[in-house]
Design a protein with these regions (language model features):
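N-terminal Rossmann-like NAD(P)+-binding subdomain of aldehyde/semialdehyde dehydrogenases
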Residues: 1-122
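Well-ordered alpha-helical segments embedded in enzymatic catalytic cores
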Residues: 19, 141-144, 198-199
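Secondary-structure boundary motif
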Residues: 36, 55, 180-181, 205
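Short, ordered loop/turn segments at secondary-structure junctions
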Residues: 39, 160-162, 194, 217-218
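Conserved small-residue-rich beta-alpha loop and adjacent elements
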Residues: 95, 99-182, 210, 221
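Conserved NAD(P)+-binding/catalytic subdomain of aldehyde/semialdehyde dehydrogenases
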Residues: 130, 190-222
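Short helix-terminating capping/connector loops at secondary-structure junctions
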Residues: 183-187
Length: 222
């Protein structure tokens, strides 16, 4: 593929391009649907997601997947400090999600007014669209990434390959059930389900994104 801005040629497998395209397409559709969802339903999602993370039965498969990720990463000689899903990380995820649930933000809200007498200038908060994240291999990124739903955005993210099993388990066991329990479209939060680093390039090159955020360093987030 050729980058739209620079024209630089990158080797991105066709199946990776399709995986990214499908994820963004679902997020675009979900963004449109989210505009009709009441704020209370979005808050319910955050609360339900937090509840499921705190539920031992629901969280068990996630811990098992994380142990597999950690074991594989160690066998490859990689650092696992941020990869291992500790009780503190779990608690921080719950706290972050509950914070989003309680935060007094609306998707469409006037934030400032400058009065010039005969006329005025207003600033409004409104949804952006699809927000993309590329993260290193940290399982707690779900609490960070899903925060954009608070103001009516949808999200697509790619996580480092070391944490992909954990991410899949969180998605399947916790995230999707929380979305459905709250009545939100499944496409609201999309994981780019590919271990290929090139998926990050394909994601950030998609013109349908409203905002792209990279967290970390090196080629894993490049």
């Amino acid at each position: 593929m050729a980058l739209r801005r620079s024209g630089e040629l990158l080797a991105v497998p066709a199946e990776v391009v399709k995986t990214v395209d499908d994820a963004v397409s679902r997020a675009v559709e979900a963004f449109q649907q989210l505009q009709a969802v009441p704020p209370a339903a979005i808050n319910t999602f955050f609360s339900r997601f937090a509840d499921l993370i705190g539920d031992e039965n629901a969280f068990g498969p996630v811990l098992a997947a994380n142990r597999d990720d950690v074991t594989k990463a160690k066998s490859l000689g990689r650092a696992t400090g941020r990869l291992e899903l500790t009780e503190k990380m779990r608690s921080d995820m719950i706290g972050g999600l509950r914070m989003w649930a309680e935060l007094p933000l609306d998707r469409l809200e006037r934030t400032d007014v400058v009065d010039h007498g005969a006329w005025s200038v207003e600033s409004w908060r409104s949804p952006l669209g699809v927000v993309a994240f590329v993260f290193e291999g940290r399982p707690n990124v779900f609490a960070d990434a899903t925060g954009v739903l608070k103001t009516g955005n949808s999200v697509v993210f790619r996580i480092g390959s070391d944490a992909l099993r954990t991410a899949r388990a969180i998605r399947d066991r916790l995230l999707v059930p929380a979305l459905r329990d709250a009545g939100l479209p499944d496409g609201s939060v999309q994981l780019v389900d590919s271990p290929e680093r090139s998926a990050g390039w394909a994601l950030f090159d998609d013109p349908r994104l409203a905002l792209a955020v990279a967290r970390g360093s090196g080629p894993a987030v490049g």
